[in-house]
Amino acid sequence: MMLVKKAGITMMVHAENADMIAVLQKYYLDRGKTDPVYHYYSRPPVAEDEATSRAIYLAKMADCPLFVVHVSTKRAMEAIRDAHIAGQVVFGETCTHYLTLTTDCLAKPGFEGAKYVCSPPLCSQLH
């Protein structure tokens, strides 16, 4: 991020904790849990929340402008908002499917559920 700041550009990140996801993916795969809904279970909202907060802290340390893409959770959005209000140059964007669809779509039978696999995954309405 320091090099990005030095170059005068904005860092763009897709924020998900890859280590957390790798552990959960292995856990579900080892148990034969491969239905589309397990894409959500292996990438829980906390994976995005933690990675978004970490990116914000690192950007603050580097004094680097930050743009978080594909924001899908309330906590990630709140972290971006709070940092922005505090004066940090940080922005986020989301996609229509995160505002209109939920994990219920992933639970559809057969290939139908696979049509809704995206990353970060669709969340429940609570997130």
What does each of the following model-derived ranges do?
Residues M1-H127:
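Histidine/acidic residue-rich metal-binding segments in metalloenzymes
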